[in-house]
Each structure stands twice: as structure tokens, then as C-alpha cells.
Amino acid sequence: MGIKVYKPTTNGRRNMTSLDFAEITTNTPEKSLLVSLKNKAGRNNNGRITVRHQGGGHKRHYRLIDFKRNKDGVEAVVKTIEYDPNRTANIALVHYTDGVKAYILAPKGLEVGQRIISGPEADIKVGNALPLANIPVGTVIHNIELQPGKGAELIRAAGASAQVLGQEGKYVLVRLQSGEVRMILGTCRATIGTVGNEQQSLVNIGKAGRNRWKGVRPTVRGSVMNPNDHPHGGGEGKAPVGRKAPSTPWGKPALGLKTRNKKAKSDKLIVRRRNQK
């Protein structure tokens, strides 16, 4: 999709851009694959804020996406390419030959009328899903499982992709979007191609109201709060932090402290870290 530029008729429209939605083929989603979503506004079951900066925004229906792609040997036809308000990627409605309908992530290059299939014998073609062990070295993939049969957990955002680097025993080496090289079981599935809608990251929001439409509330700096609300708060005028290091609202170190579990079992599966040259 291309980027749409607006004339600066107001300050909000100045520098504002949006997607032109040229790839979208319908505005009407498949009703059988919709689930209602309740707006939690970042609150838990006690009504307390557990995730800040959430609330408001447009009502949405959740689209049930097939992340497992486990209907082996059953061909499907792409019927529509649709917008999904719950993710950055577009989605595609596919009709299987046995009558089942499903949504999948729409990879770059997938077109209406195209036929796709899943299984170990599937061709290396955009939209097809195979076990990692059956995918040749150098192939660009997305929608990757971490546990066989659980459903894809990696490389699902718009424009994201990974690459198969090789095979070591029952594991396959995959270079992720971040540059991290990781070993993943060869029986885990992945889909061929890059996730579509890659220009989504180039959109300039332009005004605060567009973020409010998305359910994103303002982020207030700790330094302008009172000391009972934030460790950075208080003081006369623009006071410094007053601590050895910046803190979160709950007093924990912020900005740079590593939060990964040092005993994470998946450490042994990471061949190269994302920040290594």
C-alpha cells in the first residue's frame, strides 16, 4: 500500500499521512470469524490500572486468525484482503475446499484468487505453511511457531520477516527481524514470505486525536507529577531527578536495566544475541 499525503488545511493535517488502503478488497468482515471485545481500559478485575495509557478509542471486533495453519493437504483460495484494527498487518480471508473459512495474516504479494496450502509437501510459495525442517536454507519466512502445534508467536507484525540459515539436528537456525539467531524445532511451522503492509511504519500520526481513536491515552512525564505520584516528582521548577538513576513510577530502575530472566531456559537456544555485531 502507498502513503497518502494531506494538504496542510489545519495544523493537525500538516505533516499527517495515512495508508491509501489500495490492497483492501472489502470493508465487510466475515461474521462467523468475529468475536466481541470489551474495552478494559488497562484495568484488572479489581478495577485498578495495570497497564497505563490505555482507554477510549473506537469499538472493535476481534478477528479470529488461524496462526496454526494445520489443515494439511487441503487447498484454500484467497477471497479477500481486509483491514484488521487489532494488528498492524492486513489479513486475508481464505475458503478451504472442504467449506471451512479462516483468516490468515496477509503476506506481501498475496492476491485474491491465489491458492495456498499447508503441510510438509507444500511448495515453497508465498502464503504456504510448512514445518521449518522442510523449508530450504535462505528462504524468507514469517508467522513462526516456537512450540509445535501451539500456533505462531514470532514475526507477525507488518513488514516483519525472518530467514532460515541452516539445520542442526532436530533444530533449524533462524535469523529473526532483530538480528537474533535462534534455534527452533524443525517440526514448528512457518509461512513463506514477508508480512504485508510494510509501509505501515512510515505513517505519521500527525495529531494526538488519532492516537486517542486507537485507544492510546497521553503519557505524562514523571518530573511534572507530585512526589507522591512519581519518584521524579516534586521540587521547585524544573528540578532534576534527585536519584542515582531514573526510576519507574514504582521506584524500579528505568532506562537501560536489563529485564530478561537470567535463568531463562530459552537462553540455550539463542545462538547470537540481537545486539551483537
UniProtKB/Swiss-Prot annotation:
SMART domains in alphabetical order: Ribosomal_L2, Ribosomal_L2_C
Region: Disordered, residue numbers: 222-277
Keyword Magnesium: no
SUPFAM superfamilies registered for this protein in UniProt: Nucleic acid-binding proteins (SSF50249), Translation proteins SH3-like domain (SSF50104)
One GO term (biological process): cytoplasmic translation
Any one GO cellular component localisation term in the record: large ribosomal subunit
A Pfam cross-reference name: Ribosomal_L2
Keywords: Ribonucleoprotein, Ribosomal protein, RNA-binding, rRNA-binding
Entry superkingdom: Bacteria
Gene Ontology MF terms in the entry: rRNA binding; structural constituent of ribosome; transferase activity
Alphabetical list of PANTHER family matching this protein: LARGE RIBOSOMAL SUBUNIT PROTEIN UL2M, RIBOSOMAL PROTEIN L2
Task of the protein: One of the primary rRNA binding proteins. Required for association of the 30S and 50S subunits to form the 70S ribosome, for tRNA binding and peptide bond formation. It has been suggested to have peptidyltransferase activity; this is somewhat controversial. Makes several contacts with the 16S rRNA in the 70S ribosome.
Protein family according to the UniProt entry: Belongs to the universal ribosomal protein uL2 family.
Subunit and partners: Part of the 50S ribosomal subunit. Forms a bridge to the 30S subunit in the 70S ribosome.
Protein name from the UniProt record: Large ribosomal subunit protein uL2
Name of the gene this protein is made from: rplB
